[in-house]
A protein has these predicted regions:
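C-terminal structural segments of small proteins and small subunits
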Residues: 6, 29, 51-82
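Compact, glycine-rich, soluble single-domain proteins
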Residues: 6-42, 47, 51-52
Length: 82
């Protein structure tokens, strides 16, 4: 499954958004990928998410694949855009 979202101001919402995003992603069994400007990362990789440099206003493509892909897609999109 895929969805495109605009990243909200996650720095203001979460104390440590990178670690919290990875923790959220690790709560799902599905593979979760993030893509922006030609960069593709695994959302369960702390180093990958740090290098990705999520910022407010970024347009990110989220892709999920696996048993709980619908829940994972909704959870990650809500985390990044709510």
């Amino acid at each position: 499954m895929k969805k495109t979202i605009e990243v909200s101001d996650i720095e203001k919402k979460y104390k440590n958004p990178v670690a919290q995003l990875v923790e959220t992603a690790c709560g799902y069994s599905s593979h979760i990928g993030l893509e922006c400007d030609g960069k593709n990362i695994n959302a369960k990789s702390l180093m990958g998410v740090m290098a990705f440099g999520l910022k407010k206003g970024m347009i990110v493509n989220i892709s999920t694949e696996g048993d709980d892909c619908e829940l994972a897609l909704e959870g990650i999109s809500e985390f990044l855009s709510a």
